[in-house]
Swiss-Prot record:
The protein's name in its UniProt record: Uncharacterized protein YKL100W-A
Length: 29
């Protein structure tokens, strides 16, 4: 599993996954 210092990252990533912009955020991961 990936360790994340802030749970916000998971929340944002999960939300972006539903949106088309998620592709851009996924690159930041």
């Amino acid at each position: 599993m990936i360790k994340v210092p802030l749970p916000d990252v998971i929340f944002v990533a999960h939300r972006n996954k539903h949106t088309r912009q998620g592709n851009i955020t996924q690159t930041k991961y």
